[in-house]
Design a protein with these regions (language model features):
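A short, conserved alpha-helix within the catalytic core of class I
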Residues: 91-104
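Structural motif
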Residues: 32, 83-84, 109
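Conserved beta-strand positions in the Rossmann-like core of class I SAM-dependent methyltransferases
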Residues: 54
Length: 189
């Protein structure tokens, strides 16, 4: 039996997730992984088993290296050693992406899982994201989910203009209600 579109399921489309990450791993020398939503570390087992790795998860029953709010970690921790940031969230990865873009220097890969199309179609995107996109706080836009690619482009451009994280190259794929994106970024200032 399949799960309804709104029900979260860990690692649906595992093949696509692994393929996107394997592409990203080839983009950096000596990858050092920061996994912001590590869960039960299925992706670590599939992609990162022999690599330096640090996993974050809020749930205390997971084998994470630290159990905390990943935004707090991204705001305060030294991110210098990480050059591969994995943000596999059930919803909107852009808050974490923007924090990484603000604080990370040098060349790095960011892998994002977006499951925001359902939220976007119901106009449940964050106030912050609406602000960046130029959408008034209370405005409801029918079928906004059709513009996921445009919204992703705006967020990447915002990271470049606001924080100097230059987008170099990337790939994307989608399946069901999830979009997968890996981008190579470089920040020199």
């Amino acid at each position: 039996m399949s799960n309804p579109a709104w029900q979260t399921v860990d690692n649906t489309n595992l093949f696509l997730k692994v393929a996107i990450r394997n592409w990203g791993l080839k983009q950096v020398n000596e990858p050092h992984i920061l996994d912001c939503f590590c869960g039960y570390q299925e992706l670590r087992k599939a992609c990162y088993s022999d690599l330096p790795y640090f996993g974050i998860d809020k749930k205390s029953d997971t084998p994470a290296d630290i159990h905390c709010d990943n935004m707090e970690y991204l705001r305060t921790a030294d991110l210098t050693r990480y050059n591969f940031i994995d943000i596999d969230v059930y919803g909107n990865p852009w808050e974490q992406f923007l924090m990484v873009s603000k604080r990370k220097h040098g060349k790095f890969v960011c892998v994002l899982t977006e499951c925001i199309e359902f939220n976007v179609n119901t106009n449940s995107i964050s106030i912050g994201m609406k602000g960046i996109l130029g959408i008034p706080r209370k405005m409801k836009i029918p079928c906004l989910g059709r513009h996921i690619e445009f919204m992703r482009s705006v967020m990447v451009k915002y990271a470049d203009e606001k924080f100097g994280s230059k987008y170099i190259t990337g790939i994307r794929s989608s399946a069901g209600n999830a979009n997968y994106f890996a981008g190579v970024f470089e920040k020199t200032n």
